Regions:
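Hydrophobic ligand-binding cavity/cleft-lining segments
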Residues: 1-62
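Generic detector of isolated residues embedded in canonical secondary-structure elements
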Residues: 16-17, 81, 124
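Short edge beta-strand segments in beta-sheet-rich domains
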Residues: 34, 77-79, 107
């Protein structure tokens, strides 16, 4: 069985602020589980879009019933690929775990799109949870636990982004006042 988590959210910020915050969201008080973020590649291609690949190391709290399968491993590596189209004010992000994929594979597809009418940035999350674990009953349990954990953490993701966006705007405001 494969589980999907879907969610939408509107940030009351312009597209530029949201995308700057996205690439600067770590560290923040709501993401203490993120240990490191490394930019592997960033380039503007002929189509005028910005392409970025990052590697993220996260710590995780696992339920006791999973530990026999993973041992003492408490972290995971995530690859993140993003494409920003400045003309359409849209960013697409794809994240997936690089390790523990036989136990659980988590793939996150996120679209950020500026809405000219409401002057907000709409975010559409689609997250796929799939396990290749063959032990009877464990596969569905792992997928369900991962799905529920992601759903619980969504609130912290939103708070973390809002925190970083407010800091971005504060920095911009300070720079404008210095120039006056």
């Amino acid at each position: 069985m494969v589980l999907w988590y879907r969610n939408v959210h509107d940030y009351q910020f312009d597209f530029e602020t949201v995308t700057v915050a996205f690439f600067n969201k770590y560290p923040n008080p709501y993401a203490s589980h993120v240990q490191s973020v490394d930019t592997l590649k960033r380039e503007i291609k002929e189509d005028g879009k910005l392409y970025t690949t990052r590697l993220i190391k996260k710590n995780g709290k696992l339920p006791s019933w999973v530990k026999p399968f993973l041992g003492k491993i408490s972290h995971s590596w995530i690859i993140e690929q993003t494409v920003i189209d400045p003309k359409t004010k849209e960013m697409k992000a794809y994240q997936r775990n690089l390790d523990h994929t036989k136990i659980i594979r988590v793939e996150e597809y996120t679209t950020y799109k500026f809405n000219d009418q409401t002057e907000t940035t709409n975010v559409n999350y689609n997250v796929k949870f799939s396990s290749n674990f063959q032990t009877f009953g464990v596969k569905n349990r792992i997928e369900a636990w991962s799905h529920n954990r992601f759903k619980e953490n969504t609130q912290n993701t939103t708070k973390g982004m809002a925190y970083v966006m407010a800091r971005c705007q504060e920095t911009i405001w300070k720079k404008k006042n210095i120039q006056v």
